[in-house]
Amino acid sequence: MFDSATYQRRRQALRNKVQNGIILILGNNEAPANYPDNTYKFRQDSSFLYFFGHSHPGYAGVIDIEAGEDYFFGNDVDMDDIIWMGPQPSVKELAAQVGIQKSFPFSQLKEVVGKAIAQGRKVHFLPPYRFDNMMLLEDLTGIRAAIVKKYASVELIKAVVDLRSVKEACEIAEIDLACNIGYEMHTAAMRLCKPGIKEQYIAGVLDGIAASYGSMTSFATILTQHGETLHNHDHSHILEPGRMMLTDAGAERVTNYCSDHTRTVPVGGKFEGRQKDVYNIVLACHDKALEITRPGITYISVHLEVCKVLVQGLKDLGLMKGNVEEAVAAGAHALFLPHGLGHMMGLDVHDMEDLGQIYVGYDDEIRPSSQFGLASLRMGRRLQEGFVITDEPGCYFIPALIDKWKAEKMHTDFLNFDAIEKFKDFGGIRLEDDILITSEGSRFTGEKRIPITIEEVETIMNE
């Protein structure tokens, strides 16, 4: 947690952005895995963390705009809880830690919300993503759980996005620390990547490194020699010579700030032939994004410039042909890069994705595309100092997609399918770093950059 002044300042800033009514921010509850007392590792709602600070289940906060007051709701523990869990701070104590003087039992939340509704006041809430909170909102507001998400306050969503998008110095420091853990995770994976090792073993080591810092991974670890599957959580394979291992993994600090990095390395520690060729193309794409990323530029334009680097590189390999700009405009490159360049990052690894990418990654100026590949770009809007985003180009050879496009004669003016056929067993490469937008451009987050050049990767893998 940060100091109480941080949370007071954030709630006041939110109050200033919402015209009237009350703002309801629900925390999360424990989620049973297979019976009530055996729960998944608890993860608090990120907006509740941002405005109310506490990573404990079963709480809610209310910001009353006209009254200028904040309320904290939760239940104190009883003796049975103390026997099993030990002494716990009271709700009043938790509220005071984040600068709130008025705390109430959770049962009184319905009275406060009901009174506001009876007075004709607006009750602002964010889109719920957990079913228990959908049901709670039905109980509080009378809106059916099945449709309550449609009634989330757009005014509140936009206000929260405005505040959470620009990271404070204390947040940047936490992200840097999360990236330091990410450095340990990824360099461990590089050292362990050898023929005969099971993917699951390495993935388990990475998860253990994150846990050893009192935190957890920021998402389910992706570690596979089948990098052509973008989010491959199957760790069942034995690493084979001649393949490449893609590791997309991140850590989450005890404060819940995240890291998210991807590296792709050769099994056995030495890039060979076409591995080196494709890797250098992806690295050039990655470096192009770093070169031009700065405040004021739209990230969709950065994405498209990176795609031009990809097309030129694939032309040089004989896999693509024709005019580079026309190929990108047509979307022919999406055969190899069917996702976007990056996304926001912070308290969520895909920051604020629960609020809707239409508000987080886009705005009234920049709207999402419907073109295949470009439609998957999560972040297109104009960049501002203080944003933390990912830079994650890739190049994938997806057999099913290649077969489909070839059969449908897709983009034959730009794609050399005969040459592409020879790469169907290649897999995929992705390289990802977390980037802070600064006043002058951008910088990597974390103390040290994870090895990324061919020389750096081969050196650490063969130490």
Which residues are covered by each model-predicted region?
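Active-site neighborhoods and metal-handling regions in enzymes and metal-associated proteins
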Residues: 1-463
